[in-house]
Amino acid sequence: MIITISGTAGSGKSSVAKALSKKLDYKHYSMGDFQREIAKAKGLSIVQLGELEKTDPSIDKMVDDKQINLGKTQDNFVIDSRLSAHFIPNSFKIFLDADINVRAKRITKVREAESYADVQKAIDASIKREKTNQERFIEYYEF
């Protein structure tokens, strides 16, 4: 069985995916971690990578292809990604969301590489990231 966990930034996708994969003894994949690795390799923040993705579709393609390949070649795993349910249609799908203030607090607490001066800065960055993602999703995937 393949379980896809989608949701908003800071909603707990990775935490739930890790706990579920441990409970089921499944492999865990995180496309958010994969994107953070790409950002780090390019010397960018995750927000800056999102801005770059607006004009460079090769980054999204790399992430999309990774998910598609996992869905076609592996079984018994949990993956957290905003679009994993789309790219792995034969999966059990979970969507998570939380209040923006809760999400911002989680982001400021959990992700050292994305450190923000305060919760409001995390809220602003989350809103900007979601807006950037939504614009790309409409352009690239028509949803």
Model-derived features: positions:
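P-loop (Walker A) phosphate-binding loop of NTP-binding proteins
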Residues: T8
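Glycine-rich phosphate-binding loop used to anchor ATP phosphates in small-molecule kinases
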Residues: T55-I100
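Small-molecule kinase domains that catalyze NTP-dependent phosphoryl transfer to phosphate-bearing small molecules
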Residues: Y116-F143
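Conserved phosphate-donor/acceptor-positioning beta-strand/loop module used by diverse small-molecule
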Residues: P89-R111, A117-I127
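Conserved lysine of the Walker
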Residues: K13
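Hydrophobic anchor at the beta1->P-loop junction of P-loop NTPases
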Residues: I5
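Conserved substrate/cofactor phosphate-moiety recognition/catalytic segment
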Residues: K22-V63
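Hydrophobic positions on the alpha1 helix immediately C-terminal to the Walker A/P-loop
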Residues: V16
